[in-house]
Amino acid sequence: MLKDKTAYRVAVVGATGAVGAEMIEILEERKFPVEALFPLASARSAGGTVLFQGQDVIVEELTNDSFKGIDIALFSAGADVSRQYAPIAAKAGAVVIDNSSAWRMDKDVPLVVPEVNPHDVEHHQNIIANPNCSTIQMVVALKPLHDRVRIKRIVVTTFQAVSGTGKDAMDELMDECRDLLSFRAAEPKVYPYQIAFNCLPHIDDFLPSGYTKEEMKMVNETRKIMGDASIQVTATTVRVPVYVGHSEAVNIETEHKITANEARALLSIAPGVILYDDPEHKIYPMPLDVAGQDEVYVGRIREDESIPNGLNLWVVADNLRKGAATNAVQIAELLVR
């Protein structure tokens, strides 16, 4: 049992990627009791080093034998890698916390946001799923309201940073900005169109319904995490030329009336939330405010005047941290408490 130990052997799969690097940094920041760190990556990245607790740790190639003696394995290397290696790690005795979409909707795999449904961790069978970045920040902001007045319907539009796609996308935005400001044509490779000075209403593949996979992740994951399949959710997800920090315009319809001031009072004491809402003094959350932060920032709270029980919110968070790496490490903390 993990709780019987005082320090843990932790593997990070995808250790050289944007989220994997954040996971390693956050393990150290939050003083997670690591006995030994095992950074794992593809053969191409193996042999390099990552810095942990002042020491250079060699990145090893991910293989079927990588999980012997591992207590906790943090995965952030994409769904294909997770489908292949997470069962191997789980069978070897490690508890897998997976940041990909591979296991999120599996009925036997808990999908956990510690501020929302920490109790679901107890039902794991050695694999726990980390939700989609845009889902995480939204449910952290909405759970206190749902508990008070029950949310019937959610309409959300996201404005998602390029770091959600990965390092190559961040480089592409920088290269395109440089080229365009030098009067050279942009040459997109990661995205189907230029992302610099542009917005793309297209994240992940399109489905026959006209929605994207990203949009349906928000629909299905929200219901599972909140434990309420009756919540109606519709989403539009947009990629924007921002490096770090996802923003969301969220509209909710509730079963019972809640005023903007009542919502502010609830959110001001909600775990993991920072209320940042004083429009009169131009105070509202922006991606620049949240970069490097672990909390979900909420502002622009106002009643929806078009329906009796409606509320609008603006929700912003660091997608690499709370939207991925921090949430994963918080799940690990739940396991060892």
Residues of each region from the PLM?
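Charged docking surfaces used in two-component/phosphorelay signaling
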Residues: 73, 162-337
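N-terminal Rossmann-like NAD(P) cofactor-binding subdomain of oxidoreductases
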Residues: 1-195, 230-232, 282, 296-297, ...
